[in-house]
From Swiss-Prot:
SUPFAM superfamilies: 4Fe-4S ferredoxins. InterPro entries: 4Fe4S_Fe-S-bd (IPR017896), 4Fe4S_Fe_S_CS (IPR017900), 7Fe_ferredoxin (IPR000813), PSI_iron-sulfur_center (IPR050157). Binds 2 [4Fe-4S] clusters. Its cofactor is [4Fe-4S] cluster. GO terms for cellular component: cytoplasm. This is Ferredoxin.
Amino acid sequence: AHIITDECISCGACAAECPVEAIHEGTGKYEVDADTCIDCGACEAVCPTGAVKAE
């Protein structure tokens, strides 16, 4: 699964890109549902701050 670090600026690019809708808005940053995430890396590729990391 992927994780979203504190560099997240809540722009929503990752959530819009996720093909399985595993990313949702959390408190202060977006969060990845590890059970739904398919590790495709689409979110990591579009994050402007590099906040999305492979776990």
